[in-house]
Each structure stands twice: as structure tokens, then as C-alpha cells.
UniProtKB/Swiss-Prot annotation:
Protein's organism: Methanothermobacter thermautotrophicus (strain ATCC 29096 / DSM 1053 / JCM 10044 / NBRC 100330 / Delta H) (Methanobacterium thermoautotrophicum)
A Pfam family that the UniProt record links to this protein: DUF167
Alphabetical list of Gene3D superfamilies matching this protein: YggU-like
Matches recorded under InterPro entries: DUF167 (IPR003746), YggU-like_sf (IPR036591)
Tree of life domain: Archaea
Taxonomic classification: Archaea, Methanobacteriati, Methanobacteriota, Methanomada group, Methanobacteria
Family statement drawn from the similarity comment of this UniProt entry: Belongs to the UPF0235 family.
Matching NCBIfam families: DUF167 family protein
Full protein name: UPF0235 protein MTH_637
């Protein structure tokens, strides 16, 4: 279940706090970490030479149909991404539909 602690609307954009598990198979958003207040994200790429960051940007852009950038945590597993033109409600709806996460 995703709580609002990991999501923040800034103008027309949405900031999302994520925790990345690199080299984990295919891309997915399997759960929400209550303690860290971050959405857990699995990606295929290893954390080498920016491969993981490029995959995060590509997969989020394709999944949500929006431009995405990493705004903090470029060299960390804990990152904050900006999804342009995405509101909180639409994000929660799409995550629920595409990844089956329970939304409060």
C-alpha cells in the first residue's frame, strides 16, 4: 500500500521517492517500503556507468507516458524522480492498474 509520504506535487509535476534494486530481473514496482517511505523499484541493469539510471528513466517514461528525470540520488539506491505533467491521483491509479499495488 502506497502512502502519500513518498509523493509530492510540485506545480504540474510529481516527485516520487524510490528505492532501487538493480540487477533484479525485469522492471517492476512490487511494493512500498513503509520504513523508508519509498516505492521499491526493481530493474534489470546493474549500477554501473549510469546503466541503472538510464533504465529507470526509460522504464518510467514508457510506463507513465511522461518525461522523467532523476532529481536526487544519482549514485544512490535511494532516488527522487520527477515525472512531468503527472498528478498524484493519476500516478496512484496507473501504479495500481499496471503493478497491482494496493492504494489506500
Amino acid at each position: 500500500m502506497i502512502t502519500m509520504d513518498c509523493l509530492r506535487e510540485v506545480g504540474d509535476d510529481l516527485l516520487v521517492n524510490i528505492e532501487v534494486s538493480p540487477a533484479s530481473g525485469k522492471f517492476g514496482i512490487p511494493s512500498y517500503n513503509e520504513w523508508r517511505k519509498r516505492i521499491e523499484v526493481k530493474i534489470h541493469s546493474p549500477p554501473q556507468k549510469g546503466k541503472a539510471n538510464r533504465e529507470i528513466i526509460k522504464e518510467f517514461s514508457e510506463t507513465f507516458g511522461r518525461d522523467v528525470e532523476i532529481v536526487s540520488g544519482q549514485k544512490s539506491r535511494q532516488k527522487t524522480i520527477r515525472i512531468q505533467g503527472m498528478g498524484r491521483d493519476l500516478f496512484l491509479k496507473l501504479v495500481s492498474e499496471k503493478f497491482g499495488l494496493e492504494i489506500p
